Amino acid sequence: MNNMKSADNYQQLDNNALEQVVGGKYYGNGVHCTKSGCSVNWGEAFSAGVHRLANGGNGFW
């Protein structure tokens, strides 16, 4: 992957710093929610649905 940055460029956060991070929750099926609402990546959601049907309803993949 050419767009990945080296791990040397990142700083590890301690628990106090991690508590200050503001973000949302990703559900793994194309749905991402924050405090202001949820959004859907429809391409990923469709793909997750197809995979779920192919697996007999077992999980997202």
From Swiss-Prot:
Cellular component terms (Gene Ontology): extracellular region
Write out the GO MF terms.
pheromone activity
Biological processes per GO annotation: defense response to bacterium; killing of cells of another organism
Q: Which cysteines are joined by disulfide bonds?
A: 33-38
**InterPro entries per the record?**
Bacteriocin_IIa, Bacteriocin_IIa_CS, Bacteriocin_IIa_dom_sf, Competence_ComC
Keyword Secreted found: yes
- Propeptide at 1-24
Family classification: Belongs to the bacteriocin class IIA/YGNGV family.
Q: Function, please?
A: Active against L.monocytogenes and several lactic acid bacteria.
Please identify the protein, giving its name as recorded: Bacteriocin leucocin-B
Species source reads: Leuconostoc carnosum
